[in-house]
Protein backbone atom coordinates (compact mmCIF):
# COMPACT_ATOMS: atom_id res chain seq x y z
CA UNK A 1 0.00 0.00 0.00
CA UNK A 2 2.86 2.34 0.74
CA UNK A 3 4.23 1.92 -2.77
CA UNK A 4 0.87 2.86 -4.32
CA UNK A 5 0.56 5.94 -2.19
CA UNK A 6 4.10 6.96 -3.11
CA UNK A 7 3.32 6.60 -6.81
CA UNK A 8 0.11 8.64 -6.44
CA UNK A 9 1.88 11.44 -4.64
CA UNK A 10 4.66 11.55 -7.23
CA UNK A 11 2.08 11.71 -10.06
CA UNK A 12 0.28 14.63 -8.40
CA UNK A 13 3.57 16.50 -8.02
CA UNK A 14 4.36 16.07 -11.73
CA UNK A 15 0.92 17.35 -12.72
CA UNK A 16 1.24 20.33 -10.41
CA UNK A 17 4.70 21.22 -11.74
CA UNK A 18 3.59 21.23 -15.44
CA UNK A 19 3.19 24.70 -17.05
CA UNK A 20 -0.31 26.01 -17.79
CA UNK A 21 -0.98 27.15 -21.37
CA UNK A 22 -3.84 29.55 -22.14
CA UNK A 23 -6.38 28.54 -24.77
CA UNK A 24 -6.03 30.73 -27.90
CA UNK A 25 -9.07 32.92 -28.47
CA UNK A 26 -10.36 33.45 -32.09
CA UNK A 27 -9.79 36.93 -33.40
CA UNK A 28 -12.95 38.94 -33.92
CA UNK A 29 -13.02 41.06 -37.11
CA UNK A 30 -12.88 44.70 -36.29
CA UNK A 31 -16.20 46.39 -36.93
CA UNK A 32 -15.91 49.25 -39.39
CA UNK A 33 -16.04 52.67 -37.85
CA UNK A 34 -18.40 55.38 -39.12
CA UNK A 35 -15.39 57.11 -40.67
CA UNK A 36 -14.76 54.01 -42.75
CA UNK A 37 -18.29 54.25 -44.21
CA UNK A 38 -17.77 57.92 -44.94
CA UNK A 39 -14.42 57.30 -46.63
CA UNK A 40 -15.66 54.31 -48.68
CA UNK A 41 -16.76 56.58 -51.51
CA UNK A 42 -13.47 58.48 -51.74
CA UNK A 43 -11.70 56.06 -54.09
CA UNK A 44 -9.10 53.34 -53.93
CA UNK A 45 -6.98 55.18 -51.33
CA UNK A 46 -9.72 55.02 -48.70
CA UNK A 47 -10.39 51.35 -49.50
CA UNK A 48 -6.72 50.53 -49.01
CA UNK A 49 -6.54 52.44 -45.72
CA UNK A 50 -9.59 50.66 -44.26
CA UNK A 51 -9.48 46.92 -45.04
CA UNK A 52 -12.70 46.33 -43.12
CA UNK A 53 -14.70 48.56 -45.43
CA UNK A 54 -13.11 46.94 -48.49
CA UNK A 55 -14.16 43.45 -47.40
CA UNK A 56 -17.65 44.74 -46.59
CA UNK A 57 -18.02 46.25 -50.04
CA UNK A 58 -16.79 43.06 -51.65
CA UNK A 59 -19.31 40.93 -49.78
CA UNK A 60 -22.19 43.23 -50.71
CA UNK A 61 -21.26 43.13 -54.38
CA UNK A 62 -21.48 39.35 -54.35
CA UNK A 63 -24.96 39.27 -52.84
CA UNK A 64 -26.29 41.64 -55.50
CA UNK A 65 -25.82 39.01 -58.24
CA UNK A 66 -28.86 36.88 -59.14
CA UNK A 67 -27.74 33.58 -60.64
CA UNK A 68 -31.25 32.19 -61.24
CA UNK A 69 -31.91 34.64 -64.09
CA UNK A 70 -30.02 34.00 -67.33
CA UNK A 71 -28.41 36.81 -69.17
CA UNK A 72 -30.02 38.33 -72.23
CA UNK A 73 -29.59 35.77 -75.00
CA UNK A 74 -31.11 37.87 -77.75
CA UNK A 75 -34.50 36.16 -78.01
CA UNK A 76 -36.15 37.12 -81.29
CA UNK A 77 -32.95 37.57 -83.25
CA UNK A 78 -32.35 33.85 -83.70
CA UNK A 79 -32.79 32.48 -87.20
CA UNK A 80 -35.51 30.01 -86.27
CA UNK A 81 -37.45 32.68 -84.39
CA UNK A 82 -37.31 35.02 -87.37
CA UNK A 83 -38.34 32.15 -89.65
CA UNK A 84 -41.39 31.46 -87.48
CA UNK A 85 -42.44 35.12 -87.55
CA UNK A 86 -41.99 35.23 -91.33
CA UNK A 87 -44.17 32.14 -91.87
CA UNK A 88 -46.92 33.57 -89.65
CA UNK A 89 -46.73 36.88 -91.52
CA UNK A 90 -47.16 35.17 -94.91
CA UNK A 91 -50.01 33.07 -93.50
CA UNK A 92 -51.91 36.14 -92.28
CA UNK A 93 -51.41 38.13 -95.48
CA UNK A 94 -52.22 35.15 -97.74
CA UNK A 95 -50.55 36.79 -100.75
CA UNK A 96 -47.06 36.88 -102.33
CA UNK A 97 -44.53 39.03 -100.49
CA UNK A 98 -41.04 40.13 -101.46
CA UNK A 99 -37.94 39.81 -99.32
CA UNK A 100 -37.97 43.56 -98.64
CA UNK A 101 -41.53 43.40 -97.31
CA UNK A 102 -40.66 40.50 -95.02
CA UNK A 103 -37.56 42.34 -93.76
CA UNK A 104 -39.67 45.44 -93.09
CA UNK A 105 -42.10 43.37 -91.03
CA UNK A 106 -39.30 41.68 -89.06
CA UNK A 107 -37.49 45.02 -88.59
CA UNK A 108 -34.21 43.32 -89.45
CA UNK A 109 -32.33 42.71 -92.71
CA UNK A 110 -32.62 39.26 -94.24
CA UNK A 111 -29.26 37.56 -94.04
CA UNK A 112 -28.23 34.93 -96.61
CA UNK A 113 -28.80 32.24 -93.98
CA UNK A 114 -32.37 33.40 -93.31
CA UNK A 115 -33.13 33.68 -97.03
CA UNK A 116 -31.93 30.12 -97.53
CA UNK A 117 -34.19 28.91 -94.71
CA UNK A 118 -37.19 30.68 -96.24
CA UNK A 119 -36.59 29.15 -99.66
CA UNK A 120 -36.21 25.61 -98.29
CA UNK A 121 -39.16 25.75 -95.89
CA UNK A 122 -41.91 23.27 -96.81
CA UNK A 123 -44.67 25.73 -95.81
CA UNK A 124 -43.41 28.49 -98.13
CA UNK A 125 -43.49 28.59 -101.93
CA UNK A 126 -40.70 30.65 -103.51
CA UNK A 127 -41.28 32.06 -106.99
CA UNK A 128 -37.86 32.39 -108.58
CA UNK A 129 -39.17 34.43 -111.49
CA UNK A 130 -40.84 37.15 -109.43
CA UNK A 131 -38.68 36.57 -106.32
CA UNK A 132 -41.68 36.41 -104.02
CA UNK A 133 -42.63 34.21 -101.08
CA UNK A 134 -46.12 32.74 -100.59
CA UNK A 135 -47.53 30.67 -97.76
CA UNK A 136 -48.24 27.05 -98.76
CA UNK A 137 -51.30 25.65 -96.87
CA UNK A 138 -52.03 21.99 -96.24
CA UNK A 139 -54.69 22.07 -98.98
CA UNK A 140 -54.54 24.50 -101.88
CA UNK A 141 -58.18 25.48 -101.37
CA UNK A 142 -59.01 29.15 -100.91
CA UNK A 143 -62.65 29.47 -102.05
CA UNK A 144 -65.97 27.65 -102.10
CA UNK A 145 -65.61 26.77 -105.78
CA UNK A 146 -62.22 25.22 -105.14
CA UNK A 147 -63.64 23.17 -102.27
CA UNK A 148 -66.52 21.80 -104.37
CA UNK A 149 -64.14 20.92 -107.20
CA UNK A 150 -61.85 19.09 -104.81
CA UNK A 151 -64.70 17.12 -103.19
CA UNK A 152 -66.11 16.16 -106.59
CA UNK A 153 -62.71 14.81 -107.66
CA UNK A 154 -62.61 12.37 -104.74
CA UNK A 155 -63.55 8.76 -105.47
CA UNK A 156 -65.20 8.35 -102.09
CA UNK A 157 -67.43 10.66 -100.09
CA UNK A 158 -64.76 11.46 -97.54
CA UNK A 159 -65.07 14.55 -95.40
CA UNK A 160 -62.52 17.27 -94.74
CA UNK A 161 -61.44 18.90 -91.52
CA UNK A 162 -62.36 22.57 -91.36
CA UNK A 163 -59.31 23.18 -89.18
CA UNK A 164 -57.08 22.10 -92.06
CA UNK A 165 -59.05 24.25 -94.53
CA UNK A 166 -58.65 27.29 -92.28
CA UNK A 167 -54.87 26.95 -92.66
CA UNK A 168 -55.06 28.60 -96.08
CA UNK A 169 -58.66 29.88 -96.06
CA UNK A 170 -59.21 32.25 -93.12
CA UNK A 171 -62.93 32.98 -93.71
CA UNK A 172 -63.84 29.35 -94.41
CA UNK A 173 -66.68 29.25 -91.86
CA UNK A 174 -68.67 32.08 -93.43
CA UNK A 175 -68.50 30.64 -96.94
CA UNK A 176 -69.31 27.12 -95.76
CA UNK A 177 -72.49 28.32 -94.10
CA UNK A 178 -73.55 29.90 -97.39
CA UNK A 179 -72.85 26.64 -99.23
CA UNK A 180 -74.88 24.78 -96.61
CA UNK A 181 -77.88 27.04 -97.19
CA UNK A 182 -77.61 26.33 -100.92
CA UNK A 183 -77.56 22.59 -100.25
CA UNK A 184 -74.09 22.08 -101.70
CA UNK A 185 -72.35 20.72 -98.59
CA UNK A 186 -73.17 18.97 -95.33
CA UNK A 187 -71.63 20.27 -92.11
CA UNK A 188 -70.94 18.46 -88.86
CA UNK A 189 -71.01 20.85 -85.91
CA UNK A 190 -69.82 20.56 -82.35
CA UNK A 191 -72.53 19.75 -79.82
CA UNK A 192 -71.51 22.45 -77.35
CA UNK A 193 -70.91 25.56 -79.48
CA UNK A 194 -72.35 24.53 -82.85
CA UNK A 195 -69.10 25.38 -84.63
CA UNK A 196 -68.55 23.56 -87.97
CA UNK A 197 -66.04 20.75 -87.58
CA UNK A 198 -66.24 18.60 -90.74
CA UNK A 199 -67.61 19.16 -94.24
CA UNK A 200 -68.92 16.71 -96.86
CA UNK A 201 -70.21 17.10 -100.39
CA UNK A 202 -74.00 16.87 -100.55
CA UNK A 203 -75.02 14.34 -103.20
CA UNK A 204 -78.23 15.80 -104.57
CA UNK A 205 -78.99 12.58 -106.46
CA UNK A 206 -79.93 11.04 -103.11
CA UNK A 207 -82.59 13.66 -102.50
CA UNK A 208 -86.11 12.22 -102.90
CA UNK A 209 -89.58 13.43 -102.05
CA UNK A 210 -91.37 11.66 -99.20
CA UNK A 211 -95.07 12.22 -98.60
CA UNK A 212 -96.07 13.79 -95.32
CA UNK A 213 -98.18 10.74 -94.50
CA UNK A 214 -95.12 8.49 -94.48
CA UNK A 215 -93.16 11.08 -92.56
CA UNK A 216 -95.86 11.13 -89.91
CA UNK A 217 -95.91 7.33 -89.66
CA UNK A 218 -92.13 7.32 -89.33
CA UNK A 219 -92.13 9.83 -86.49
CA UNK A 220 -94.93 7.98 -84.68
CA UNK A 221 -92.84 4.83 -84.27
CA UNK A 222 -92.09 4.56 -80.53
CA UNK A 223 -88.44 4.39 -79.65
CA UNK A 224 -87.54 2.59 -76.42
CA UNK A 225 -85.39 4.37 -73.84
CA UNK A 226 -81.66 4.36 -74.33
CA UNK A 227 -81.07 1.89 -71.51
CA UNK A 228 -83.59 -0.61 -72.92
CA UNK A 229 -82.68 -0.15 -76.58
CA UNK A 230 -79.99 -2.84 -76.64
CA UNK A 231 -82.22 -5.45 -75.01
CA UNK A 232 -85.14 -4.63 -77.33
CA UNK A 233 -82.96 -5.09 -80.39
CA UNK A 234 -81.62 -8.33 -78.98
CA UNK A 235 -85.16 -9.76 -78.75
CA UNK A 236 -85.42 -9.56 -82.54
CA UNK A 237 -81.94 -10.91 -83.19
CA UNK A 238 -80.49 -7.54 -84.17
CA UNK A 239 -76.98 -6.39 -83.34
CA UNK A 240 -76.80 -3.19 -81.32
CA UNK A 241 -73.74 -1.11 -82.12
CA UNK A 242 -73.10 -0.44 -78.44
CA UNK A 243 -73.08 -4.14 -77.50
CA UNK A 244 -70.69 -6.89 -78.51
CA UNK A 245 -72.50 -8.88 -81.26
CA UNK A 246 -71.09 -12.16 -79.95
CA UNK A 247 -73.03 -11.70 -76.70
CA UNK A 248 -76.41 -11.22 -78.43
CA UNK A 249 -78.68 -14.29 -78.26
CA UNK A 250 -80.86 -14.61 -81.29
CA UNK A 251 -84.45 -15.70 -80.77
CA UNK A 252 -85.02 -19.08 -82.45
CA UNK A 253 -87.56 -21.91 -82.44
CA UNK A 254 -88.22 -23.73 -79.22
CA UNK A 255 -85.89 -26.66 -79.38
CA UNK A 256 -85.98 -29.54 -76.91
CA UNK A 257 -82.73 -29.95 -75.06
CA UNK A 258 -80.69 -32.89 -76.21
CA UNK A 259 -80.42 -35.73 -73.72
CA UNK A 260 -76.99 -37.03 -73.01
CA UNK A 261 -76.39 -40.64 -73.88
CA UNK A 262 -75.35 -42.84 -70.98
CA UNK A 263 -71.75 -43.76 -71.07
CA UNK A 264 -71.19 -47.48 -71.72
CA UNK A 265 -68.29 -49.23 -70.13
CA UNK A 266 -66.13 -50.74 -72.77
CA UNK A 267 -63.84 -52.66 -70.48
CA UNK A 268 -63.05 -56.35 -71.12
CA UNK A 269 -63.21 -58.85 -68.28
CA UNK A 270 -60.04 -60.91 -68.31
CA UNK A 271 -60.44 -62.96 -65.10
CA UNK A 272 -63.27 -65.31 -66.24
CA UNK A 273 -61.06 -68.35 -65.61
CA UNK A 274 -61.40 -67.94 -61.86
CA UNK A 275 -63.85 -70.38 -60.22
CA UNK A 276 -65.19 -67.81 -57.85
CA UNK A 277 -67.07 -66.17 -60.70
CA UNK A 278 -69.08 -69.32 -61.47
CA UNK A 279 -72.58 -69.97 -60.09
CA UNK A 280 -72.56 -72.97 -57.71
CA UNK A 281 -76.06 -72.46 -56.26
CA UNK A 282 -77.46 -75.56 -58.02
CA UNK A 283 -75.01 -77.80 -56.19
CA UNK A 284 -76.39 -76.99 -52.77
CA UNK A 285 -78.14 -79.97 -50.94
UniProtKB/Swiss-Prot annotation:
Compositionally biased spans, kind Polar residues: 1-10, 33-44
Transcription listed as a keyword: yes
InterPro entries: TFA2_E-tether, TFA2_Winged_2, TFIIE-bsu, TFIIE_bsu_DNA-bd
Biased amino acid composition, Basic residues: 258-268
Gene Ontology annotations for the cellular component aspect, listed alphabetically: nucleolus; nucleus; transcription factor TFIIE complex
Main localisation: nucleus
GO biological process per UniProt: transcription initiation at RNA polymerase II promoter
Composition skew (Low complexity), residue ranges: 45-55
Family: Belongs to the TFIIE beta subunit family.
Assembly and oligomerization: TFIIE is a tetramer of two alpha (tfa1) and two beta (tfa2) subunits. TFIIE associates with RNA polymerase II via the beta subunit.
Protein name: Transcription initiation factor IIE subunit beta
Species: Schizosaccharomyces pombe (strain 972 / ATCC 24843) (Fission yeast)
Amino acid sequence: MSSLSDQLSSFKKKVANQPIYAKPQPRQPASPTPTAYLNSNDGHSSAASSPGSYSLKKKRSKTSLVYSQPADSGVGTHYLSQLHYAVEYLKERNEPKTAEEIASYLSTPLTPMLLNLLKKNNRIYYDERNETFTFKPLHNIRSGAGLLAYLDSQKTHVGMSIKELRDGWPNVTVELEELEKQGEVLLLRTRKDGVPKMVWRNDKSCDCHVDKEFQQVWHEIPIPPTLDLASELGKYGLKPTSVDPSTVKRAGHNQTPKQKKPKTRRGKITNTHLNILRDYSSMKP
